[in-house]
């Protein structure tokens, strides 16, 4: 029984030493990040509220946009400036 208690105490001591070394490493990392940290602006955009041409194209092949007239050269593509599939649009 004494051996079991001694073994358990050694295991707990080993875990505590390991936890202390991990905590010290985390503190060193935070200190390094703060020293090298600069004011940086980050901009994240998930698209405009109206959607994009790729999203519109993904919704349906050959689907005409109700706000755009059909192309005079080909009847299957809309004449939208945002349509990525229309080869007739001047770019």
Curated annotation (Swiss-Prot):
Q: Report, as the record phrases it, the tissue specificity of this protein.
A: Paneth cells of the small bowel.
Pro-peptide region(s) = 20-65
UniProt-listed Pfam families: Defensin_propep
sequence repeats mapped onto the chain: 65-67, 68-70, 71-73, 77-79, 80-82, 83-85
Among the GO molecular function terms of this UniProt record, one is: identical protein binding
What keywords appear on the UniProt entry?
Answer: Antimicrobial, Defensin, Repeat, Secreted, Signal
Q: Where is this region: 6 X 3 AA tandem repeats of C-P-X?
A: 65-85
- State the residue spans of region: Disordered: 22-55
- One GO location term (cellular component): extracellular space
Which Gene Ontology BP annotations are present? defense response to bacterium
Q: Its function?
A: Apparent precursor of a secreted, cationic, proline- and cysteine-rich peptide that contains Cys-Pro-Xaa repeats. Unlike cryptdin, the proposed mature peptide region lacks the structural motif characteristic of defensins. It may have microbicidal activities.
Protein's UniProt name = Alpha-defensin 31
The organism of origin for this protein: Mus musculus (Mouse)
Lineage, uppermost ranks: Eukaryota, Metazoa, Chordata, Craniata, Vertebrata
Gene name in the database record? Defa31
């Amino acid at each position: 029984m004494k051996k079991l208690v001694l073994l358990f105490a050694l295991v707990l001591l080993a875990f505590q030493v390991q936890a202390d070394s991990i905590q010290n490493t985390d503190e060193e990392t935070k200190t390094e990040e703060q020293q090298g940290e600069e004011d940086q602006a980050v901009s994240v955009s998930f698209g405009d509220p109206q959607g994009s041409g790729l999203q519109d194209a993904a919704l349906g092949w050959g689907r005409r946009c109700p706000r755009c007239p059909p192309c005079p050269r080909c009847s299957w593509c809309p004449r939208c400036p945002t349509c990525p599939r229309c080869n007739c649009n001047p770019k």
